[in-house]
Amino acid sequence: MLKELPNEQLNLISLCFVQDFKYKKLEIDEKLDEIVNKQITNIEKDCKKFKDAIIYFGNGYMGEKNKHGMPDGMGNLLFHASEDFYVGQFNNGLKHGLGKYTYMSGGGSAHHPFSIPYYAGEWFADSYHGLGKHLITEYESLMIYEGTHTHDKKTGFGTYKRFNNDDVDKFCNTELIGYFLDGQGFKLMIEINRDDNGSLTKNTPSGFFEYDLEKGEKTPLLLFNEIDEWEKKIEPKKMDKELLDIFNDSYKEFFNLDPFTKEFSDLTIKVKKNVMQLMFDTNKYFEKNSEDENYLKFLQKINSLNKVVTQIDEKQKLIELNEMIEKEKKEFVSIEKKLNS
């Protein structure tokens, strides 16, 4: 642990980490600006040309489709029950690529009646995955997360921002910058706490901290006395090799998690496409078989399997789930013969 190092060495290493984290933050900010304010904005403009709507799982869809009639390419999806909507790219019925999901069902919350939550960024197999920006309205303070998402979780490098009011164009009052594991600060974090004038607060320290999630504790490694120390005096800089070795050792367990592997991602989209195709094939019989109890039970079972996919974070469990889906596909072959078409 860094806090066990001699003070002189600790200060030097902490400053190097802060420089690197600032470099990563600026790099992500630049990429996110390109994704959210340029690429997705262009997709939203292009999607306005679509006029003909179809019903897709009880929701309204306007856009490009594949040969099976599933969303594929660019399009707009309006969810009937919640009035949420997604504008962006699809692959075989899945939100996949770039897009923006607006949570109309979460708008007008008691805390923030005029703020509508959304996620804009990269998607993979119906999940937030890659770089994205997430406006969060469910807490007393308005919050924004900007950074890496991994299979629907705020896992990876990013920045959490907290605002004392609903003006997100103004500076935020709290920033947490570093690596997150399912939304929780992991090990080393930069924490900036500002008052409503933009200066550092006197009661809550700002600086570079070592977090201990199990104990719920944080240890200051390098403190800032003035906001300029962070905003102007600290120059962003990539890590050198010696520091990179310390970093890799500290975060070894983090990057060895299954969701970071290509194998896990490949398996996830395979399972998602598999269950989505099965849902699509089974739901087209609904209109003429809505009173068939066996058919309805089968639909519920498939819908449950679909919800489970994004909750799994271990490769072996994904493999087991895919085996279950393959088994259900075989069962549907016999069920299909008894359905009215």
Located regions from the model:
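PAZ/PAZ-like end-binding module
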Residues: 227, 234-341
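Intrinsically disordered, low-complexity repeat tracts enriched in Gly/Pro/Ser/Thr and acidic residues
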Residues: 1-239, 302, 321, 325, ...
